[in-house]
Amino acid sequence: MANIEKQAGELQEKLIAVNRVSKTVKGGRIMSFTALTVVGDGNGRVGFGYGKAREVPAAIQKAMEKARRNMINVALNEGTLQHPIKGAHTGSRVFMQPASEGTGIIAGGAMRAVLEVAGVRNVLSKAYGSTNPINVVRATIDALANMKSPEMVAAKRGKTVDEILG
């Protein structure tokens, strides 16, 4: 399902989906391919890319380039999430919550690939609604982007981390 490769520069790349699509024109159908990939450094940086070309390798290459350009930083807490989070994109909704050490990545399909390359080692998650890989990846990255560390919350409120954590 998701192929992983190590790149120089220590970026992990995963291929989530390759689809054959067609455009119908007067002379028949024009076939092309789309590829969905995620890239991460395994330490809180993750991005996804969607590429389209007449050949599969070209589509994958375009998707990888877009993924490297669109990376976000995620505030992780010792290999898990900071707090329970929800994300949504079109018909896909995802819910993720932190898990104790040894739980592993409990996630399905496209969500698992995103979490693995982001560096999350322990998480409980569930995808609701549409399980279209593109929308699930976008919803997962939306959720991770909205996650706040205690330091970020403390800075925003003008308090210390100890006051925030109680």
UniProtKB/Swiss-Prot annotation:
Residues 11-74 form the S5 DRBM domain. One of its GO terms (biological process) is translation. One of its GO terms (molecular function) is structural constituent of ribosome. Keywords: Ribonucleoprotein, Ribosomal protein, RNA-binding, rRNA-binding. GO terms for cellular component: small ribosomal subunit. InterPro entries: Ribosomal_Su5_D2-typ_SF, Ribosomal_uS5, Ribosomal_uS5_bac-type, Ribosomal_uS5_C, Ribosomal_uS5_N, Ribosomal_uS5_N_CS, Ribsml_uS5_D2-typ_fold_subgr. Pfam families: Ribosomal_S5 (PF00333), Ribosomal_S5_C (PF03719). It comes from the Bacteria. Transmembrane segments: none annotated. With S4 and S12 plays an important role in translational accuracy. PANTHER family: MITOCHONDRIAL RIBOSOMAL PROTEIN S5 (PTHR48277:SF1). Part of the 30S ribosomal subunit. Contacts proteins S4 and S8. The N-terminal domain interacts with the head of the 30S subunit; the C-terminal domain interacts with the body and contacts protein S4. The interaction surface between S4 and S5 is involved in control of translational fidelity. Belongs to the universal ribosomal protein uS5 family. HAMAP family: Ribosomal_uS5_B. NCBIfam families: rpsE_bact. This is Small ribosomal subunit protein uS5.
